[in-house]
Regions:
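C-terminal segment of N-terminal export signals and the immediately downstream linker at the start
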Residues: 21-38
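Short active-site oxyanion
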Residues: 32-33, 56-58, 88-91
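Conserved redox-active cysteine motifs that mediate thiol-disulfide chemistry
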Residues: 38-49
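Extracytoplasmic/secreted envelope proteins and their assembly/folding machinery
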Residues: 48, 63-66, 98, 102
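Iron-sulfur (Fe-S) cluster-binding segments and ferredoxin-like electron-carrier domains
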Residues: 49-56, 60
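Thiol-based oxidoreductase modules, predominantly thioredoxin-like and allied folds used
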Residues: 58-69, 78-79, 87
Length: 152
């Protein structure tokens, strides 16, 4: 390779590489999460670890007012999960799989958030075997409408 060819290669390759650098840096930054849970709940700790292992930075806050936090966040009582998280301007209630959270964050729907009601066996952070599909609901801003957001 001649000096001129090398110079041309560097003149085109380096700027192109530089354009991708910010994307690489952003991908490595963990997504902040605030997770509220009952002080005695160990599955919530397991779920927080699951999020930490999948690109999130979780701040766990123990509270005895979890139902009130969920209600104020717009989650209907019959759709409440085991814990309530706040991620990227949305509420995520229960043991929602990471792929579903990422889907919501990528699509940016006009909703309050998503919820996986109860404590389904085999869901992220829960023990046991998965006994059926995990149905994650989208909760509208007025809380009146809940529709299926994703099924895992």
């Amino acid at each position: 390779m001649t000096r001129r060819e090398f110079a041309m290669l560097m003149a085109t390759a380096l700027p192109a590489w530089g354009l991708t650098a910010p994307k690489r840096a952003r991908a490595a930054e963990p997504i902040p999460v605030t997770l509220y849970k009952n002080p005695q709940c160990s599955c919530c700790e397991s779920y927080a670890q699951y999020l930490d292992q999948n690109g999130f930075k979780v701040d766990v806050k123990a509270t005895n007012d979890l139902a009130e936090i969920s209600r104020k966040a717009g989650i209907p009582e019959h759709l409440e999960g085991c814990h309530t998280s706040f991620i990227g301007g949305y509420v995520v209630d229960g043991h929602v799989p990471v792929k579903t959270i990422r889907k919501m964050l990528d699509e940016k729907p006009a909703i309050v958030g998503i919820t996986l009601p109860g404590m389904p066996p085999g869901s992220p952070g829960m023990g046991g075997e998965k006994t059926g599909s995990l149905i994650v609901y989208a909760v509208s801003r007025d809380g009146a409408v809940a529709s299926i957001f994703d099924v895992d």
